[in-house]
Regions:
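N-terminal membrane topogenic signal
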Residues: 4-22
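Hydrophobic transmembrane alpha-helices
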Residues: 24-51
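Aromatic-anchored segments of alpha-helical transmembrane domains
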Residues: 24-32, 73-84, 124-135
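Membrane-interface helix caps and helix-loop-helix hairpins in membrane proteins
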Residues: 32-40, 83-92, 111-112
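Membrane-embedded alpha-helical segments of multi-pass membrane proteins
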Residues: 43-56, 93-103
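Cytoplasmic-side transmembrane-helix entry/capping segments in multi-pass membrane proteins
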Residues: 66-74, 94-96
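Alpha-helical transmembrane segments in multipass membrane proteins, preferentially the mid-helix core
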Residues: 100-119, 130
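Membrane-interface transmembrane-helix boundary segments in multi-pass integral membrane proteins
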Residues: 139-178
């Protein structure tokens, strides 16, 4: 199949596929850390799983995967800074997963751009991973807030499901905003520009 592509096209593809190695390294570094501390359940947090999704999207050239992972890097970075950095400090593997993850996402979007509807896939991915987290992770970890009300919000919400409904609505709005921000920066290129680039 390689002979069917122009040399210029092949060269252009190599860097972005190779870029997938970085989020894979970030994911594996976190996996090693949590394996050593016997906390592998934490690998299902959105940002950790997002690095794996980003790597797969880059390796297999799947724009939808790249975009949904990229959208999650924005709220993920904020949540990580507030609830991890300010509370526990900076850790190498965690920093790579979040700061490195958003850096790779921004580079990847230079090629794959952003779709205005991509936030819906990011939201669907969140619901799926939260459901999986509820069944396969220890309740004590409360991964993706799938088991109980977030610490500090117990007085505001009398039940987990009222908390979940608000959380889900806020998450949907946040992902929409993140998607629109990235779309405003990485709008799809006009068809005429794409033709010029391919020539």
């Amino acid at each position: 199949m390689l002979c069917c592509y122009p040399v210029k096209t092949l060269i252009a593809r190599i860097p972005y596929r190779t870029l997938g190695v970085l989020p894979l390294i970030f994911f594996l570094a976190q996996a090693v850390y949590y394996w050593r501390t016997n906390q592998l359940g934490h690998m299902l947090w959105m940002c950790n799983a997002g690095n794996l999704i980003m790597a797969l999207g880059l390796f297999f050239e799947k724009p939808a995967l790249v975009r949904l992972a990229a959208i999650w890097t924005l709220p993920g970075l904020v949540v990580w800074f507030v609830y991890v950095v300010l509370a526990w400090g900076v850790f190498l593997t965690s920093t790579l997963a979040h700061v490195g993850g958003i850096a790779v996402a921004l580079i990847a979007l230079k090629r794959y751009r952003m779709d205005r509807a991509a936030w819906r896939y990011a939201f669907g991915w969140y619901l799926l991973l939260q459901l999986i987290s509820r069944f396969v992770t220890p309740p004590a970890f409360n991964v993706n807030l799938a088991h109980s009300v977030a610490s500090g919000w117990e007085r505001t919400f009398q039940s987990y499901w009222s908390f979940w409904l608000v959380l889900t609505a806020v998450t949907a709005v946040t992902l929409w905003v993140a998607g629109m921000i990235l779309w405003s920066i990485f709008r799809p290129r006009p068809a005429a520009e794409l033709v010029v680039r391919e020539v």
